Amino acid sequence: MIYDGIIVGAGHAGVEAALAMAKMKLNTLLITGDLTKVATLPCNPSIGGPAKGIVVREIDALGGQMAKSADLSQIQMKMLNPSKGPAVRALRAQIDKLKYPKVMLDVLQNTPNLTLLQGFVDTLIVEDNTVKGVNLEDGSQVFAQTVIITTGTYLGSQILIGHEKTSSGPNGERTTRGISNQLKNLGFEMLRLKTGTPPRIARDSIDYSKTVPQPGDGVFQTFSHDSPITDLGHQEFSYLIHTSPDTKDIIFNNLDASAMYGGVVEGVGPRYCPSIEDKFVRFKDKDRHQIFIEPESMDLNEMYIQGLSTSMPKHIQEQMVRSLPGMENARIVRYAYAIEYDAINPRQLYQSLETKVIHNLFCAGQINGTSGYEEAAGQGLMAGINAGLKVQGKKPLVLKRDEAYIGVLIDDLITKGTSEPYRLLTSRAEHRLLLRNDNADIRLRDYGYQIGLVDDATYERFEHKKIALKEMIERAKSTKINPTEENLNYLASVNSSPIYEGVTVFKLLERPELKIETLKHFLPSDYNHEIYEQLEIYIKYDGYIEKARREADKLLRYESRFIPNDINYHSIHNISAEAKEKLSKIKPETLGQATRILGVGPTDVSMLLVYLEAKNA
């Protein structure tokens, strides 16, 4: 039989891609080396964080799975930056790393149109620059209309501890070389990247009296807009400590022993998740660095030491760990390591995540040069959607930079490329006030429903929410608060100045000191906290949001101006030589994308626009 889509690898990108295609009623095959290890968390036991938490919400709005699985597996939930503006708020959860893969496997096994196969892919079947399927290591072949590669850090991977180098994937699992070599031979530009993970410490060997406990928020909040949970359950603590002067001395005295500084590492590491060696070398003026001790699972006697990623030899790791407060007698359960792996140059991808080199071949996740579970899952979802749309003969779904962080991520990758593991940051999004944690469903739910990933019941609840929000906005504008004794006493109780004449709730809530509680006091209803949160943001930031929307709309004419793929840039007059070279290499799909290419200036864009208009005249 010929499948509609084959997904190679069942990490965070692979499972989202497979579920998306299957939900689109397409015959889908997901191949992975070990079905008990789908969507594992080989590094940090957490999901979410700045920008990343919003990506998880976006995945959920589009009909993906990560948010629901995270809610079911969380052991601590926290809203980051709650006192700051809504543009930078984001959820972060500690995840039970044993439970999360089980939850995801259960979803995969119960999804219609999805077949799971435990096995190893050796190479792709490619004919006439078009992928036709895959060759398995056992000699069998499987054919499909599309193939999505989501191999994570397993392509040509090597584990590095000190000067020891082992051919292996994360946690001693198998690496794969066949696909990596084949991609190179097919004309893909390969990158060599590096990431790392810290040691894991026995939970019962830590003296917690020397740490600062870090609890969750203690309030019910979820990643999913339609969460399968109704309470958070037992919440674990994380713990904060700092490195000691001894830690710094141990590192500087042994830098040559590190894989990173001993010349063993070839790959480029992540700028925003440096090793502890990197932190001390790059920031010599800092005497200490934060370390967070985080639980890995309710059922594991292991704690994750965030901030202590290293490639030092094991005996140096022992010294480093025992130099930390509360870790004087700590036992290392698993040692830290660095891992090198192959990735492709993401500028060889279209915005749909289909490759420019081989037709019907899509790539998603760390193979595209990103870091992080959330970035991988977002790409996997989009690759699955667009592979499905291609099978259905429809246009790809391309999320714009003012629509989603996922859109920012993909646009950055395919336009600017990367020479190091790419991490999504709030600062990368110029329209971040539009891309908030609270409004992911408003931005993206319609797309998920139209494609077939969001069911009727879920969409109906979303429609009711929009109606409720509209009703509450009208109530806030029409409900007048008069200076009665009761109202004046209430305002005094929340440290707000008195009113001297009637004022609407909408106008009153423009006061910075008044929050959601005031809305609930003056506009009581049966609606949930989410409605009140969005109402508060609408009232307080309406002017700013409208301004951001107008600025985004100005750029829309460039984003919607498509550029033919066969255009000869060298024939266009008055464009700089550098711009011609960059445009010819990257082949931007829209004028908007062309504006973001390094080396393409405003004059070049203007001349390109003149050329396109003359050609269409």
Curated annotation (Swiss-Prot):
Its cofactor is FAD. The keyword Thylakoid does not apply. It holds the Pfam family GIDA_C_1st. FAD binds at residues 9-14, 121, 176, 366. One of its GO terms (molecular function) is flavin adenine dinucleotide binding. SUPFAM superfamilies: FAD/NAD(P)-binding domain. This is tRNA uridine 5-carboxymethylaminomethyl modification enzyme MnmG. NAD(+) binds at residues 269-283. InterPro entries: FAD/NAD-bd_sf, GIDA_C_N, MnmG, MnmG-rel, MnmG-rel_CS, MnmG_C, MnmG_C_subdom, MnmG_C_subdom_sf. GO terms for biological process: tRNA methylation; tRNA wobble uridine modification. Its main location: cytoplasm. PROSITE patterns: GIDA_1, GIDA_2. Keywords: Cytoplasm, FAD, Flavoprotein, NAD, tRNA processing. The gene is mnmG. Homodimer. Heterotetramer of two MnmE and two MnmG subunits. It is found in: Cytoplasm. Gene3D superfamilies: FAD/NAD(P)-binding domain, GidA associated domain, C-terminal subdomain, tRNA uridine 5-carboxymethylaminomethyl modification enzyme MnmG/GidA. One of its GO terms (cellular component) is cytosol. It comes from Acholeplasma laidlawii (strain PG-8A).
